[in-house]
Amino acid sequence: MSDKQTPENAVDYKATLNLPGTEFAMKANLAVREVKWLEEWYADNIYQKIRASRIGKKKYVLHDGPPYANGQIHLGHAVNKVLKDIIVKSRVMDGFDAPYVPGWDCHGLPIELKVEEKVGKVGVKVDASTFRKACREYALSQVDLQRKDFIRMGVFGDWQDPYLTMNFKQEADIVRSLGEIQKAGHIEPGLKPVNWCIDCGSALAEAEVEYEDKKSDAIDVGFGVVDLNDLSARLNVEVQDPTDIVIWTTTPWTLPANQAVALHAEIDYQLVQVQSDRGTQNFILAKDLVESAIARYKLENPVVLADFKGAVLELLQLQHPLLADRQVPVILGEHVIATSGTGAVHTAPGHGTDDYKVGLIYNLKVDNPVGGNGVYLPTAPIFSGEHIYKANPQIIEALGATGRLWAHQPIVHSYPHCWRHKTPIIFRATPQWFISMDAKGLRECALNAIENDISFVPDWGKNRIESMIEGRPDWCISRQRTWGVPIPFFVHKDTNELHPRTPELIEEVAQLIEHEGIDAWFNREAKDFIGADAEHYNAVRDTLDVWFDSGTTHYAVLRQREELTDPADLYLEGSDQHRGWFQSSLLTSIAINERAPYKGLLTHGFVVDEKGRKMSKSLGNIITPQDIIKDMGADGLRFWIASSDYRYEMTAGKEIFSRASDGYRRIRNTLRFLLANLNGFTPSTDALPVDQLIALDQYILQRAAEVQKTVQQAYEDMNFHIVCSALTNFCINDLGGFYLDIIKDRQYTTKADSAARHSAQTALYHLVQAFVRWMSPILSFTAQEAWPLIPEQTEQYVFTTEWYDIPVASTANLISEADWQTLISVKSAVNKQIEAARNAKLVGSNLSAKVEIWAKDELQSVLNQLGDELRFVLITSQVNVYPYAEQGESTEMDGLRVQISAAEGEKCVRCWHVLPDVNTHADHPGLCGRCIINVTGSGEVRKYA
């Protein structure tokens, strides 16, 4: 009878086990530790070291769209910068030299408003030069503020030498780019209607306009036909009663500027007669709108006197409803529709783009009776000195008094607002400078580039920017502001022509700006540049639209910095930039270079809360990136961003962040297991050739190679949520749920220097080398934390390496991948049966179970390949496989039945397997025969698992 192990004769076998050990902490504590790592990295010039590692390699340039240098960064900024950083780091891992030069947009109204709060308005409390100096200082302070936050997120770049649109050199190059566009014939002056913010006192770019609901006065106004005989002749019907062509408008204040009424040549119209309290009245309305219009006028029973096309009435004279001395013509326009209103459009070329365009055809006067402050000018025919919004009710009252108001009702409709002030804008014609979309074929060239030269992620970005380019008006590039790059033109006082030396003068001004900044222009007079010609020329004192500043960075940054290329490989911004930076960059580059400034455009969605609402102070739902970093660290923030599908709106909130944290922990714990089990492993002496590895280890490396293909392709396609899914799924399914669980026994219980253990460690070594690289573009801090803990690491930073070459067995694997997939399915089915037996109190842990399997022929042969090692795969103490019979319990697998019972024998104190031979060896009480061989003998031999 063998001696049983008792407390008195117990031997401590712990020292004979190969226990894991690593400095890689279980608890990340990222919020604290990341700060320390950043200090070390930047003290070591990490960005420069990454660049140095790629000298001579093919370039990949992601050009940074400059955020505005004003205020703390928000979550949208974080999404944008982290996505860019992931792309740059993954391209470096691909072997590219991928420089990243961050930039800031530094001119413009928001900065002016902030500075006005401190020093007052220009010309009131401060002169323009002092004001510009204060603007420059403020912008620089905001750059410093935002730069710290971007660095804190682990975004690598040339933070010490970013581009700023207010740098003297860049201001000069912005002026030079203007000169190039002027030289190419795309710039022209004009009195044209532009988006105008009364509060800003300036024109607005298309990208500075937002649409919000607004309550307006909708009115139907009659323009009386002056010559009824002319009308009768045109319609071939006798017309004797008063006849109005009725327009419908929501901007009564624009009626003093009316110059015409537009119909559509091909729309069907009707002359209808009704009886009103004013007597017999005729209306001319679109046929499809007669019923709704007459009902709106609270009239009944219209009698149709004539049907005709709009073209019949071209140039018919109408009486202006407010101005007795003004008659206006009927004109024809393609913009007129018959789906709402009356089918007739009030036309004021000074107050609308369509009106302006059709006015050019008919040579209509571009009348603008409204000043930049929203007050009617002294030259206005009526309501001079009155604010337009205060004049609205007066205009409506006057129309009623003259009998020209047929309907008046308030409506709520979508209306353009200033993005800064959130107030309604107006359209007003002012003398401005424009980049013409069609004079030199700019629109056509831009559309051709979109169609043929640019790739889009996601695909719908193409249609979006295409439709915007197709429909956009000429680009008004001039602004009446103080803090901006000048338009250094000299305009002849009589002819309005530019000075004949304009190209040379622009270069002269640019050279001065390069040394003195924009004050070089504003602080000099015309005679300083053109001498005696100053008597005949005015110097333009307008500034450039800030979208021109950022839109010409392909010229002022990409072309000027030797580490960058023009065109760039990629521009990446939020979806609002199809009408902003993407468009301004495309148009200026086409104008200068006749090609796009980018090969690809990537668009990301906006951040919303868990209810799908945009974040705003009023809703109290703002989450800042700083708050997330305090809680989850920058890697937590980065993982949330990467795991979201940025093509759509990105949801932020506690539940979403909790899921991201869970995913991060899964990856971190897996990484810790890999590192811990490399304890004592020296790759140069202990690693085995892949063809000599145990079958299971060969399989996991083959799976890792497949995952790496998915990861690399996902990075290349910029599908980072697929990368995150691939990482977490590999951790959960392939490693945590299968491989790592199985190898624990081999890792801990076999001889330390055995081939069985070294086989597993060789696989783990290759896995961790690949795994850390996979995660490094996204989980940069955690990847670099783990990197130096990999045995015999030679590179200082993971960021200077390339994708790992995972070795895959060249000979036919001992067990095919298909058979391993079958074994995984069997393992899952067996585990469910063990769980059921555990719930029935038949067994405790898996190792206390005996598994009996009845399998059909093909399945049986797969299982029998492993022989006795099948128990290691199933993580049970005993397994028997029999030909298929109706015994045991059926499972989810066809042809597989399983019976679970308590394993026979006793529990080994070292490996915890329950085996009959435990305590049968007097010299080794408590041990199984396998452990005795591993402790005192040559060690067990494994072939499969």
UniProtKB/Swiss-Prot annotation:
Primary residence: cytoplasm
One Pfam family here: tRNA-synt_1
Motif ('HIGH' region): 67-77
Location of this chain's protein in the cell: Cytoplasm
Cofactor(s) listed: Zn(2+)
Organism domain of life: Bacteria
Matching PROSITE patterns: AA_TRNA_LIGASE_I (PS00178)
Enzyme class of the recorded protein, top EC level: ligase
HAMAP family linked to this entry: Ile_tRNA_synth_type1
Subunit note: Monomer.
Protein name from the UniProt record: Isoleucine--tRNA ligase
Organism lineage string: Bacteria, Pseudomonadati, Pseudomonadota, Gammaproteobacteria, Moraxellales
